[in-house]
Regions:
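Bacterial N-terminal signal peptides that target proteins for export
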Residues: 2-14
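Bacterial N-terminal signal peptides
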Residues: 11-23
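Beta-propeller domains with acidic blade repeats across secreted/periplasmic ectodomains
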Residues: 27-381, 386, 390-393, 404
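Short edge beta-strand/loop segments characteristic of extracellular beta-sandwich folds
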Residues: 395-401, 453
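Short, surface-exposed alpha-helix to beta-strand junction/turn motifs within ectodomains of secreted
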Residues: 399-440, 465-472, 481-484
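Blade-terminus and WD-like Trp-Asp/Gly-His loop motifs, strongest in beta-propeller folds
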Residues: 443-446
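Surface-exposed, short loops/turns at beta-strand junctions within beta-sandwich domains
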Residues: 456-460
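Short beta-strand elements
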Residues: 479-493
Length: 493
């Protein structure tokens, strides 16, 4: 994540453009979703860094200070019967939490740990090392994130790069994504990460991670975890010879070129499935939660929800696979949370829990940490549900019927494309920007989709769609009227 000084380098260049398209809507102002803060007792410092629902009305939360707390009656509304009990303590900055059978698994700085309560008194009495050995130097920025489970029962972890060159020991796997079998066997999978805070699977079971704007990363991104992939940060390649990995180090880094050009020049380099344009869609990205609630969280089934730290918000991502590559659109979704969101977890009732802390970096909000629950009210909203690429444009699906007159007018669609520079400096402005002409707009018979034809689509570029001129059949404006589609592959005709 960025320091305040580093973030300030880009503020003046992006704020004006962001204000044109960003429609920041506080959580309490969104009638389709209600945010319920869970009051935390004064003796509990709930700086949430791991979060999972565990059934029977309870949620478990790991904290930066090395504790695991059980929140009882977590679904009580209003939350008057909440009770907090400490399950575990003494951990080294756990940054994730999952439950498997009757045990919790957390990733500490130095190891993946299994925690159990063998005598069933409500407190952990067994701490077992499952896997370790990825290397830690003591640098503050060497966070270890996870675990998250894949469908095969493997644990996935991601490892931060140290903040300065003095922190880079020759025998550490900093900047790597690793898979750990249930028996503790470590397999290094991919490299090139910077600050890979979020992990999660999509509806098809493929694993993804989020990374932060910084050196070699022009802005924040959502990346598909793939065997042998290199995501851009070269300092991770120090470990290439230490492990039996498929990652092939590029002979020369094409610094100064656009990321689209780098993807063509370096076979192992992988673009993100989605870029989150800086400031327009937050300043940082954290956890990943795939909506498999069966509609209990609204009209976005199978989509990803992604936490935002600095702006204390949640974003939404709609993915598709085109010519073997993931790509898709991101949207602002819900803001106004009480602190920076680090972890997300689905509740047993289909609600979404957000675990929060502003530790280390400033975030918007009224508190330093906390836990909130987001519930769909059932009220219809007018929003872009998905954007799908076509060989000559885009197919845009909405959550409610369109006003045909506004949606059939091609001048009501404003599009541009841009990309980022691959370099060792901190972040990148939007570069090589082009305005795109919409040559035709058509509305489907059921009025739920608009098909637009666009001149000048470009692979490897973000395509920004400003749709704020559209109206619903009832005359309503769009809830967040901009979509940001990362076009890695143009579909075949």
């Amino acid at each position: 994540m960025a320091t305040m000084r580093q973030m300030a380098q880009f503020e003046m260049g992006v704020v004006f453009a962001a204000l044109l398209c960003v429609q920041a809507l506080h959580a309490e102002e969104q009638p389709s979703y209600r945010v319920i803060p869970l009051p935390v007792p004064s003796h509990v410092i709930l700086e949430v860094t791991g979060l999972t629902a565990i059934g029977d009305g309870k949620v478990a939360a790991a904290t930066r200070r090395g504790e695991v707390w059980i929140v009882h009656n977590a679904y009580d509304n209003p939350p008057r019967a909440l009770r907090f009990s400490r399950f575990a303590y003494g951990l080294h900055e756990p940054l994730g939490l999952v439950q498997v059978d009757n045990a919790f698994f957390v990733t500490q700085r130095t190891e993946l740990t299994r925690i159990r309560d063998r005598d069933q008194d409500g407190e952990a009495d067994e701490y077992i090392t499952v896997a370790k050995g990825w290397g830690v130097t003591g640098n503050y920025h060497e966070y270890a994130y996870g675990p998250r489970l894949d469908r095969a029962g493997n644990f996935w972890l991601t490892l931060n790069i140290g903040m300065d060159k003095n922190a880079l020991g020759p025998h550490t796997w900093r900047g790597w994504g690793i898979r750990v079998s249930p028996r503790g066997r470590i397999t290094p999978v991919c490299a090139g990460m910077r600050s890979p805070c979020g992990l999660g699977a999509n509806a098809d079971g493929d694993m993804f991670y989020t990374d932060q704007q910084g050196r070699w990363f022009g802005t924040n991104g959502l990346f598909h975890l793939q065997q042998g992939a290199f995501y851009g940060h070269p300092e991770s390649l120090r470990a290439e010879d230490l492990v039996n990995s498929d990652v092939v180090a590029p002979k020369k880094l094409p610094e100064g070129k656009t990321v689209a050009e780098v993807a063509r020049l370096v076979p192992s380099y992988r673009l993100p499935a989605v870029w989150f344009p800086y400031e327009k869609v937050g300043r940082s990205v954290t956890d990943i939660a795939c909506d498999q609630t069966g509609g209990r969280y609204g009209p976005f089934s199978s989509q990803l929800f992604v936490g935002g730290f600095v702006h204390s918000e949640v974003f939404r991502v709609a993915l598709e696979k085109v010519r073997g590559e993931y790509q898709g659109a991101c949207f602002r979704f819900l803001s106004g949370f009480q602190a920076g969101i680090v972890r997300l977890a689905w509740g047993e009732d289909g609600s979404l829990f957000a675990g929060e802390t502003n530790r280390g970096w400033n975030s918007r909000g009224t508190r330093s940490y906390g836990l909130e629950r987001v519930v769909w009210t059932g009220r219809e909203l007018f929003a872009v549900r998905t954007v799908r690429a076509r060989s000559d444009g885009f197919l845009i699906e909405f959550t409610s019927a369109l006003d045909v007159e506004s949606a059939a007018r091609k001048t009501n669609y404003s599009l541009k494309s841009y990309t980022y520079t691959y370099h060792s400096r901190y972040g990148s402005p939007e570069v090589d920007t082009r305005q795109l002409a919409v040559t035709r707009a058509r509305v489907s018979q059921d009025r739920m989709r608009a098909r637009i034809e666009v001149d000048g689509l470009r692979e490897g570029y973000v395509h920004e769609l400003d749709l704020r001129a559209l109206r619903s059949a009832q005359g309503h404006e769009l809830d967040h009227g901009c979509a940001y589609y990362t076009l890695n592959r143009i579909p075949s005709p």
